[in-house]
Amino acid sequence: TGCAHLSDYPFQEYKISKFDTSTQKRAIAKTDMLKFTETSQPIGQKKYVELSKDIFIFSYLCGGINFTDIANLTQENIVNGRLHYIRQKTGKLIKIGIPQEAMQIIKKYTDESNGYLFPILNVKVHKTALQKQNRIHKIRGKVNDILKTLGKRLGIEANITTYVARHSFASVLKKSGVNIALISEALGHSDLATTQIYLDSFDNEQVDEAMKNLL
């Protein structure tokens, strides 16, 4: 992208409100995350319910990896028991350990993954970038619908989507005392400011709790 002089800006006389960099709180507690590992409630197609839960838990366990990156994972992304992948949103290389529970999820789909770790894309069907993009968009929508339904049935107030797993990963680490720089590295953020936006709402929540003890 090139740079333009201020004089070239056609809307210079208009005042535009500053973009709000705060992010909606989308994390859930560790106890709520665990509910997704224990439930086996029937909702629609069992195949997609199981896949939705597994993707949600896998993301939480593997550094909050997002849905698009999960969909594109292949066996080549596993290096010496660690997950190595380029985050599509930032182009940053992420290297993170794969917990045993996450490895078990991967193994579950070995026979039906069609060239990928998860049965979302198929190397024989989704060949162009547009085909992959459309497929990912479609399955992500289906997965999120199932997660929302599951969340309600489990009595979780938050609106559950795949992105909640990413925020929850950051939240649980923060509350466990993990350094923000390490959390930022795991999330693949380009700077600490982005990570701080993620974590500010959690800090506010803790302040609210602390203020209840003022009197």
Task: Describe each region flagged by the PLM.
Residues 38-47, 111, 144-185:
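Short, basic (Lys/Arg/His-rich) helix/loop patches that form interaction surfaces
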Residues 13, 62, 72-108, 123:
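Conserved tyrosine-mediated DNA breakage-rejoining catalytic core shared by Y-recombinases
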Residues 95-100, 104, 108-109, 200-215:
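DNA/chromatin major-groove-contacting recognition/catalytic segments
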Residues 1-10:
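N-terminal DNA-binding recognition helix of tyrosine site-specific recombinases/integrases
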